[in-house]
Swiss-Prot record:
NCBIfam families associated with the record: SA_tandem_lipo
Membrane topology: Lipid-anchor
Name listed for the protein in its UniProt record: Uncharacterized lipoprotein SAUSA300_0417
Keywords, alphabetical: Cell membrane, Lipoprotein, Membrane, Palmitate, Signal
Organism listed in the record: Staphylococcus aureus (strain USA300)
Residues of the signal peptide: 1-22
Gene3D superfamilies reported for this sequence: 2.50.20.40
Coiled-coil regions, chain positions: none
Residues with lipid group (S-diacylglycerol cysteine): C23
Length: 270
């Protein structure tokens, strides 16, 4: 009789242990699922925040931006129609162990319907030398870049006058095709980052390879960065980076941004 009681007690304890372990595993799975849902939610919010501008891509004629309204908040003065800032640069590691980047920034003032900016060539060195920075003033008329400074280098002059922003040929309307991103958030800034693997079959990747010297077959990573409120902010900014880097000290990427802010004075001197 005592033997049966002991066995019943052992079985009760055993079943209790199984129940406790099962509950704990269930809670762990629930927490994991909640965390996944939270990450997915932020991923979708980041995508939606970018979609507001990326849905306009490709903007083959940049003068269309004069008639495009962006996100407005209390930073805008009464009557200010605002200004679009479009930016693209190509950055790569150089032989000096530093970084070279070349590109253009253009400020399109919706009040005056004028576009001014500059083409830049920058070289950053690894040790003991200040970076070299050269800016060449440009303006845009009839959707054509006009070089305002004298440039002796015929190849550089040609690159400036024929320059196209990423936003003029990119098509990122199907952001939903980029899934399972690596999302990181800094609530203190706030800032939001998402990374998505791209394919070499992607038309945007093919476009970049046809326009820039990209000596690697490695498929790039699409990086999305937001500073400021996800819903929109004239004091924050958003940028895209298509990163072809091999890792380590190798840098090879194209950076693009299109932001809307209150109109400024002497934008091309910034």
């Amino acid at each position: 009789m005592g033997y049966i009681k002991r066995m019943a007690l052992y079985m009760s304890v055993f079943l209790l242990i199984i129940f406790i372990v099962g509950c704990r595993n269930m809670k762990d799975e629930q927490k994991k699922e909640e965390q996944t849902n939270k990450t997915d939610s932020k991923e979708e919010q980041i995508k939606k925040s970018f979609e507001k501008t990326l849905d306009m891509y490709p903007i083959k004629n940049l003068e269309e931006l004069y008639d495009k309204e962006g996100y407005r908040d209390g930073e805008f003065k009464k009557g200010d129609k605002g200004m679009w800032t479009i930016y693209t640069d190509f950055a790569k590691s150089n032989k000096q162990g530093g970084l070279s980047n070349e590109g253009m920034v253009l400020y399109l003032d919706r009040n005056t319907r004028t576009a001014k900016g500059h083409y830049f060539v920058k070289t950053f060195y690894n040790k003991g030398k200040f970076p070299d920075r050269k800016n060449y003033k440009v303006e845009m008329k009839n959707n054509k870049i006009i070089l305002l400074d004298k440039v002796e280098d015929t190849n550089l002059k040609k690159r400036i006058e024929n320059f196209k922003f990423f936003g003029q040929y990119a098509n990122l309307k199907e952001l939903k095709n980029y899934n399972n991103g690596d999302v990181s958030i800094n609530e203190n800034v706030p800032s939001y980052d998402a990374k998505f693997k791209m394919s070499n079959k992607d038309e945007n990747v093919k476009q970049l390879r046809s326009r820039y010297n990209i000596p690697t077959d490695k498929a790039p990573v699409l990086k999305m960065h937001i500073d400021g409120n996800l819903k929109g902010s004239s004091v924050g900014y958003k940028k895209l980076e298509i990163d072809f880097s091999k890792g380590g000290k190798s840098d090879l990427s194209v950076i693009d941004s299109l932001n809307f802010q209150p109109a400024k004075v002497d934008e091309d001197d910034e």
